[in-house]
Regions:
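Short beta-strand/turn micro-motifs composed of small residues
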Residues: 46, 58, 84, 117, ...
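An alpha-beta-alpha
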Residues: 68-106, 212, 216-229
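Alpha-helical structural signal in soluble globular domains
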Residues: 34, 94-106, 150-158
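Flexible loop/turn connectors
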Residues: 131-238
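Short beta-strand elements in bilobed, periplasmic/extracellular small-molecule ligand-binding domains
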Residues: 7, 100-123
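Alpha-helical recognition/docking segments in bacterial nutrient-uptake
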Residues: 7, 13-70, 74, 128-135, ...
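Hydrophobic alpha-helical segments within soluble ligand-binding/sensing domains
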Residues: 55-82, 97, 122-130, 148, ...
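Short acidic capping loops at alpha-helix termini that bridge into adjacent secondary structure
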Residues: 78-79, 110-114, 161-168
């Protein structure tokens, strides 16, 4: 979907309709490109295309996911499953790539059935969880906040205890009472959502002011926090 910001031309900085593209499921660059008038100021938010025509602000989760898999393996977990978003999205592809690399480097069994895909919407994680639980996963990584909250609730309903019966790594990208309640029982990958929004806002204003500015790619990094570490401790690659 698109976030569109319209503002009347009250100053030279705002003569345009400016466009944010955030969390879109569009995978065809040509379709997207056809919608954009020439000279229109655009910043892609947490999405990239192979064709680098537009500036972008995104979050890299490669290292936090890689570290989380290695930590789980170090604890003795052997069957580590992962639930990603739509497979065609650039963010999903990076996260699954990090998982695959860590599984290989840690000498864990490479089982394609341990990789499941949701759609990052409500009620999309349960079917994935059923598949992973059927395959006796002893740890699960959930790559999106809403699906992670759904996972916590679903496991609780099944009587499966976090940090005892199964290890969980949760993405945190919005304020959630469910996450707050169980944060000390699972690893977390904290998304810099405020920094992402601020960076996107600053960059779109710059493009409005200087439409011919060079194309840029601003990459932020999420923060990995193991659950048995103090809340003040965290690791980020920023």
């Amino acid at each position: 979907y698109f976030f569109v910001w319209r503002r009347p031309p009250i100053s030279p900085l705002f003569p345009y309709t400016t466009l944010f593209r955030s969390a879109s499921t569009m995978d065809d660059f040509q379709r997207f490109d056809a919608l954009i008038p020439a000279g229109f100021p655009v910043v892609l938010v947490d999405r990239i295309f192979e064709t680098k025509k537009y500036s972008s602000v995104c979050v890299s989760n490669f290292q936090p996911i890689y570290r989380s898999v290695c930590r789980l393996a170090g604890k003795g977990d052997q069957r580590i499953g992962i639930i990603g978003g739509l497979p065609r999205l650039s963010s999903t592809q990076e996260r699954i790539s990090a998982y695959r690399q860590a599984v290989a480097d840690c000498g864990l069994p490479e089982d394609e059935h341990l990789i499941q895909y949701g759609d990052s919407l409500e009620n999309s994680a349960c079917a994935c969880l059923d598949q992973l639980l059927e395959r006796k996963c002893d740890a699960i990584i959930v790559c999106q906040g809403l699906m992670a909250s759904e996972t916590i609730i679903y496991l609780h309903q099944k009587g499966i205890q976090l940090a005892q019966d199964i290890d969980l790594v949760s993405f945190v990208d919005y304020d959630s009472d469910v996450y707050a309640l169980y944060a000390n029982q699972m690893d977390s990958i904290i998304q810099p959502v405020e920094d992402l929004g601020q960076a996107a806002g600053e960059q779109i204003l710059r493009r409005v002011e200087v439409p011919d500015a060079p194309i840029f790619e601003n990459v932020l990094t999420s923060t990995y926090r193991p659950y048995n570490q103090p809340r003040a401790w965290s690791h980020s690659d920023r």
